[in-house]
Amino acid sequence: MSEDRQGRSGDSNKILYCSFCGKSQHEVRKLIAGPSVFICDECVELCNDIIREELEEKAQSARSSLPKPREILEVLDQYVIGQLRAKRTLAVAVYNHYKRIESRSKNDDVELAKSNILLVGPTGSGKTLLAETLARLLNVPFTIADATTLTEAGYVGEDVENIIQKLLQKCDYDVEKAQQGIVYIDEIDKISRKSENPSITRDVSGEGVQQALLKLIEGTVASVPPQGGRKHPQQEFLQVDTKNILFICGGAFAGLDKVIQQRSNDAGGIGFGAKVKSSERKQEVGKILAEVEPEDLIKFGLIPEFVGRLPVVATLEELDEPALIKILTEPKNAITKQFKKLFDMEGVELEFRPDALSAIAKKALKRKTGARGLRTIVESVLLDTMYELPSQENVSKVVVDESVIEHKSEPYLIYQAQPAPAKAASGD
């Protein structure tokens, strides 16, 4: 009976029925055949509706959980000191990016363009930390790529699709999650074109990498080998659409301030209308970088097409001594708080005197390492103490002052007061 009802694909006289709703081929417009199974067009439409409803529910829950720009800024303030303008720019750009993803799920007439971000600022000013904090807040996969290791496909080095493989690794090869992740490409200024004139020799780690990154950043379907695999012809690839991945590129762009100043001076003209150049009134690098225009980035060595793919530009200021002292003490994961917790696990209190914090900040400024160099300085002055402390008894407090930082003196150890020994009872 069931055989008569389903029909045989080889017998043209048998009436075929949908395996899901039971309607015959005469009651529906289309009947699609599978391996001994049939499905009608009405059931296909019903399945589409169910999937569409589920996707809409997911989009609505994501919409309600997406933090507003003000909320994003509040979280960034907990981890990153200063850089208010850059944080506001990022908060708005990230919010708009994920709103754009939501709008793509609807049948909207207006298609929103993708707004990738370029962070310009000195070493240790907080570019990577900003990107990491954003990804943690939004609970999306995040990976960091070093632009200096990238080369064009076919040359020794990493090709640009390795970036997507790293992102997949962060989310256990869940393609759907990876397609809404964040990629931070560091040292992007190091792949600038070596000169404004085209070279006869191929620039495989400069302009060539910029060309290779264009499609990836704009949005393409990247073929990535599965877990731990290498590319070879007989292999099945994972297809990852990058159109919803947010790319944040960062770099120090050393010398860009001079390019901007040159443009400003050229705009001033010559003669009576010219702007007066004064060496005494030297602007801070951060303020100069804030005036960056796309033409400055092109003159620096980024190709016009690449600059066009990074429409949101946020500039970060060089950190001064007060800002570095705040970084040492104020953020949720401040360096001094981390070391205090380590010492507390040994039952010892750790104290940094104000003059010590100032000395650490001055040392980092002298080394031109920004906030990145703070931890190195603190690690080096506390290394011997952290080595000896677990073997010592009765230490209650360790004090770090300016002499420990400047003259490499040993930190002060304060010991617990020992109870006086009980007197022996005298015999009568």
Curated annotation (Swiss-Prot):
Residues that coordinate or bind ATP: P122, T123, G124, S125, G126, K127, T128, L129
Keyword Metal-binding: yes
InterPro entries per the UniProt record, alphabetical: AAA+_ATPase, ATP-dep_Clp_protease_ClpX, ATPase_AAA_core, Clp_ATPase_C, Clp_protease_ATP-bd_su_ClpX, ClpX_bact, P-loop_NTPase, Znf_CppX_C4
Chain positions recorded as Zn(2+) binding sites: C18, C21, C40, C43
Matches recorded under Gene3D superfamilies: 1.10.8.60, ClpX chaperone, C4-type zinc finger domain, P-loop containing nucleotide triphosphate hydrolases
Coiled-coil annotated residue ranges, if any: none
Domain ClpX-type ZB: 6-59
UniProt keyword terms in alphabetical order: ATP-binding, Chaperone, Metal-binding, Nucleotide-binding, Zinc
GO terms under biological process: cell division; proteolysis involved in protein catabolic process
PROSITE patterns: CLPX_ZB (PS51902)
UniProt GO MF annotations: ATP binding; ATP hydrolysis activity; ATP-dependent protein folding chaperone; protein dimerization activity; unfolded protein binding; zinc ion binding
Protein role: ATP-dependent specificity component of the Clp protease. It directs the protease to specific substrates. Can perform chaperone functions in the absence of ClpP.
Subunit (UniProt): Component of the ClpX-ClpP complex. Forms a hexameric ring that, in the presence of ATP, binds to fourteen ClpP subunits assembled into a disk-like structure with a central cavity, resembling the structure of eukaryotic proteasomes.
Protein family according to the UniProt entry: Belongs to the ClpX chaperone family.
PANTHER family (alphabetical): ATP-DEPENDENT CLP PROTEASE ATP-BINDING SUBUNIT CLPX-LIKE, MITOCHONDRIAL, ATP-DEPENDENT CLP PROTEASE ATP-BINDING SUBUNIT CLPX-LIKE, MITOCHONDRIAL-RELATED
UniProt protein name: ATP-dependent Clp protease ATP-binding subunit ClpX
